[in-house]
Each structure stands twice: as C-alpha cells, then as structure tokens.
Amino acid sequence: MSEFVKPFNNDPFVGNLSTPVTTSTATKLYLGNLPIYRKGLTPLLRGLEIGMAHGYFLIGPFYILGPLRNSPNALLVGLFSAFGLIIILTLALTIYGLASFQDNGVGENLESSKGWRNFTSGFTIGALGGASVAYLVLNNISFFA
C-alpha cells in the first residue's frame, strides 16, 4: 500500500497525501473544468455559473421534503424557501468578502474585494434565476405533478 499512497511531491512535510485518486489525470481534468478553476472567466461569470447550478438544485429538497410537501402550494413554498436560503448564502458571501479583502477594490481577480463583489453579485443573480427556472420546469411538466 505504501507504493500507492506517498507524500505529495515526495515531501513528507507538506501535509498532503498523493493518492491514485487525487493525482489522476481524470480528477485533475474534472476539477480543472469546474467554474471556480476554469481559466478565462471573470468573477461575475464564475458566480453566475455557480449560482445557476446551486439555485437549480436548491428548490428540490424544499419541494420534496419541506413541511408543506403534501399541499398544493408545496412547489411555490419550496421556491420561496430556496430564495430565502439564497439570500442567506449571499449575505454569508458578502460578509466573507468584507472580512477577507481589504484592498479597496483594486484588481479584477477573485482574490480582490471588487472581484469578490462581482462573484457575489453573479452568484445571487444566477441562483435566483436557477431556482426560478427549476420552478418553471417543475410547474409545467406534468410528469412531476
């Protein structure tokens, strides 16, 4: 087993293990294609893409598992619950940005206050839009009724 799991870059003081899963080409390719790591995206587009994905899947648990799951208004309540969670996540992202980046908006990358504000704005718009699209899909497809 020691030939498979070894210290990262053969340095035992790094604190990271190099395993066949973490160092495989498929894993690196998959992680490299995620919007947070993809090259050439502005922070606004990163936030928009991440927000759309999160907003789209947030409505499901509130709709299926919420306290009003057996009522006719379960989908609408699930949408508003997802909106509430998105607002909470937006506040958390805003607080993180205010606490972490003190550069007064210099720079356009994600590690600056302006970039983080753009990321948060994109996340909010994308998540609200993604939840709305999921609502429209679930509301208009008779398979889910």
UniProtKB/Swiss-Prot annotation:
GO cellular component, one term: chloroplast thylakoid membrane
TM region positions: 48-68, 75-95, 125-145
Keyword Metal-binding: no
Domain of life according to the entry: Eukaryota
SUPFAM superfamilies cross-referenced by the UniProt entry: Photosystem I reaction center subunit XI, PsaL
Topological type in the membrane: Multi-pass membrane protein
InterPro entries: PSI_PsaL (IPR003757), PSI_PsaL_sf (IPR036592), PSI_suXI (IPR022980)
Pfam families for the chain: PsaL
Annotated localization: Plastid, Chloroplast thylakoid membrane
Main location: plastid
Gene Ontology annotations of biological process type: photosynthesis
Keywords: Chloroplast, Membrane, Photosynthesis, Photosystem I, Plastid, Thylakoid, Transmembrane, Transmembrane helix
Protein family: Belongs to the PsaL family.
PANTHER family for this protein: PHOTOSYSTEM I REACTION CENTER SUBUNIT XI, CHLOROPLASTIC
Listed name of the protein: Photosystem I reaction center subunit XI
Organism taxonomic ancestry: Eukaryota, Haptista, Haptophyta, Prymnesiophyceae, Isochrysidales
